[in-house]
């Protein structure tokens, strides 16, 4: 392949894979191979190349992924993958327990594919997931997180309930089982988990909204612990933390309270929290959003950046650098959050005198 095509990248020569670069796009080409033993529950110890396509296909995870195509011979489907596609079924190639024992990540992939494609998991494959679930200890938290995130970003994020139903949840990260336990305790319906996450699909399909939707009934601190355990990026963790905090904070249809909340979270996080409230049937959301738009239109100050004075102004008024200036700015911000009309430089400089006298 490297001789035939001028520009290639050695993406995995050990496994017989090179990437052809053509017209600015990359195309992976992999030699047929047979995997050796999986001693670590994730990767084969050895790889043996083979000219036999069937040998390559039978090492695949699921039948729908074990098909090949040639313009000369058409579809090669040794394991009835096309039939499973038609039936909308996730089924392992060969013995499901063997496939999951070889690579425990396949357990999460089965659940994720079922969610993404809105398929069902075949009975033997489902039983094997529950039996081999303890092997997930061999899978890195990053890889587990990637699969769960893909599931939550799919068209059927509500199928996260399958993580509990298959017994996977206790091997995800500390605290993860509590997410499901809390929902089971708080709901009396026949299908509490399915009911709880039924509306997540209505949230924007990004990591922050979907993870916040899933974790919204945990405390913000518990959510952070779970997400850090799964090695999510700091931006997502920060967004989820503040969305949940704002979602759970008591909030009246009142401009002072809304401005106060906006001073602690970003607009993106605030709107995300409102979507979480709406998800749980909070009838105050329309009124809150109406006042939020009025606050925006009026240009009300909700942050230190919007204050009509800055640290330099307070320094000139005789406040000491550091904590005193910081406390002074927060004092003024709190005044302005309650009465936006006070956000004028001369008024605030007069008000800071009251702060100095305290």
Regions found by a protein language model. Give the residues of each.
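Catalytic cores of the polymerase beta-like nucleotidyltransferase superfamily
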Residues: 1-358
């Amino acid at each position: 392949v490297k001789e035939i095509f001028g520009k290639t990248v050695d993406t995995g020569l050990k496994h017989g894979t090179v990437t052809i670069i053509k017209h600015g796009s990359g195309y992976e080409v992999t030699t047929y191979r047979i995997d050796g033993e999986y001693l670590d529950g994730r990767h084969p110890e050895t790889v043996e190349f083979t000219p036999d396509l069937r040998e390559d296909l039978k090492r695949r995870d699921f039948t729908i992924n074990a098909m090949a195509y040639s313009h000369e011979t058409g579809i090669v489907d040794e394991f009835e993958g096309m039939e499973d596609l038609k039936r909308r079924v996730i089924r392992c190639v060969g013995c499901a327990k063997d496939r999951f024992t070889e690579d425990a990540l396949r357990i999460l992939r089965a659940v994720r594919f079922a969610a993404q494609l809105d398929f069902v998991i075949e009975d033997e494959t489902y039983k094997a997931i529950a039996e081999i679930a303890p092997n997930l200890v061999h899978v890195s938290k990053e890889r587990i997180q990637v699969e769960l995130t893909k599931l939550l970003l799919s068209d059927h994020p509500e199928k996260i309930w399958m993580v509990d139903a298959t017994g996977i949840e206790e091997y995800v990260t500390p605290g993860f089982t509590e997410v499901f336990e809390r929902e089971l305790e708080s709901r009396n319906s026949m299908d509490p988990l399915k009911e709880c996450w039924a509306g997540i699909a209505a949230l924007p399909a990004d990591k922050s909204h979907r993870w916040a939707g899933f974790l919204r009934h945990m405390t913000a601190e518990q959510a952070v612990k779970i997400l850090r355990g799964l090695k999510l990026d700091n931006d997502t963790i920060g967004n989820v933390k503040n969305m949940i905090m704002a979602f759970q904070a008591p909030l009246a249809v009142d401009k002072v309270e809304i401005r106060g909340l906006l001073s602690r979270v970003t607009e993106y996080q605030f709107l995300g929290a409102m979507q979480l409230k709406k998800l749980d049937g909070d009838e105050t959301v329309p009124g809150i959003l109406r006042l939020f738009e009025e606050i925006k239109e009026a240009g009300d100050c909700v942050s230190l950046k919007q204050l009509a004075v800055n640290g330099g102004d307070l320094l000139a008024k005789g406040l000491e650098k550091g904590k005193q200036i910081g406390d002074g700015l927060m004092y003024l911000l709190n005044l302005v959050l309650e009465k936006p009309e006070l956000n004028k430089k001369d008024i605030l400089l007069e008000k800071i005198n009251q702060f100095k006298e305290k």
